[in-house]
A protein has these predicted regions:
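Metal-dependent nuclease catalytic regions and adjoining charged, substrate-binding loops involved
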Residues: 182, 195-296
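Short amphipathic alpha-helical face segments that pack within enzyme cores
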Residues: 14-17, 185-195
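Hydrophobic/aromatic-lined pockets within catalytic cores
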Residues: 19-27, 126, 157-161, 195-199
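Hydrophobic (often cysteine-bearing) scaffold residues that line and stabilize catalytic clefts
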Residues: 7, 11, 75, 186-189
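C-terminal, charged and often intrinsically disordered regions of DNA end-processing helicases
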Residues: 1-7, 296
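Non-catalytic protein-protein interaction segments used by genome-maintenance enzymes to assemble
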Residues: 107-137, 143-189
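A non-catalytic, helix-rich entry segment at domain boundaries
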Residues: 14, 18-105
Length: 296
């Protein structure tokens, strides 16, 4: 990949890895022999072992600038704490009681309104729970109290931001905060996974946010956004967005040269270079984009 990463992203991956290595029976990853994603059996690690392995991987991350270097150093202290919050949250909903926990499942979902499939990879899904014994995980009811169902879990992390330089020359960091309501993009993502996986069995959605000192679990019992009718609406929002993008690209289907297609797209689309993350694509690609739009 040529896109630049950042310490926040690398830290989030580290936490996700640690949780998956501790709880998962199977983890989907690239199979070089078959040249595609496939499930691989996971030898579950202890919580301490999972954190240690995740930190070893995170330490290999190369910062892209000085601020990113400072964030990496700070997150080396707070990643283990964030992992511990994740363990508490996962244990609270009973992930450890499932005999089939799957991570990074490859989802390839076809919607007949679209020319291309919608693809993604789940953080975690798990089966064989009974709603009557699940406590906080009990669903509001697409399934019977004793019927097996699939819980689909999406995990998000929030990280401390660098602040002012202290008198001693060290950098201060603000505390990470949990959201009071889920992010709409996260809801659309989870809605897509639930829609695709509902073909297998009834599903229960979970959206979990972590910081180094706390966590919050959103489910259909405490968050109206995750009720089935509202999840369906978020899925529809996602599909309509995909339809608009396909309609836009269809305008240029007769053009042969990639540069011609880019040139025409630049005439029709506002680049939004001030967006907080759309253009985190690496210096080379960002410079190329600026060049394309500067001539329009």
């Amino acid at each position: 990949r040529e896109f630049e990463g950042n310490a926040n992203m690398a830290a989030g991956v580290a936490v996700n890895d640690a949780l998956q290595w501790h709880y998962s029976n199977d983890i989907w990853s690239f199979n070089p022999n078959k040249r595609k994603l496939a499930p691989h059996s996971n030898d579950k690690l202890s919580k301490d072992g999972a954190i240690a392995k995740a930190m070893e991987k995170f330490n290999e991350y190369v910062p892209v600038n000085e601020t990113d270097r400072l964030k990496k150093e700070h997150y080396q202290e707070t990643i283990p704490q964030t992992c511990q919050q994740g363990f508490i949250a996962f244990d609270k909903i009973g992930v450890q009681n499932s005999n089939k926990v799957v991570a990074e499942d490859s989802i390839n979902h076809t919607d007949n309104r679209l020319s291309l499939p919608i693809v993604g990879r789940t953080d975690l899904h798990f089966t064989d729970f009974n709603a009557s014994s699940q406590g906080v995980a009990a669903s509001s009811g697409d399934h019977g109290s004793d019927a097996p169902f699939l819980s689909v879990l999406e995990l998000k992390t929030s990280w401390q931001r660098p602040g002012r330089v202290r008198k001693d020359g060290t950098r201060s960091f603000s505390s990470a905060k949990l959201p009071s309501t889920p992010n709409i993009l996260h809801l659309q993502q989870l809605a897509f996974y639930c829609c695709a996986l509902r073909k297998q069995m009834p599903v229960s959605p979970y959206l979990i946010y972590l910081t180094e000192g706390d966590f919050i679990i959103f489910n259909e019992k405490n968050c109206a956004d995750l009720e089935p009718v509202n999840l369906k609406n978020y899925y529809e929002q996602l599909v309509q967005n995909c339809i608009r993008k396909e309609r836009l690209l269809a305008r240029y289907v007769d053009l042969d040269e990639p540069d011609m297609i880019l040139s025409e797209i630049a005439k029709d689309v506002e680049p939004m270079f001030d967006h907080p993350f759309y253009w985190n694509i690496g210096a080379k690609h960002y410079a190329r984009a600026k060049e394309i739009w500067s001539t329009k």
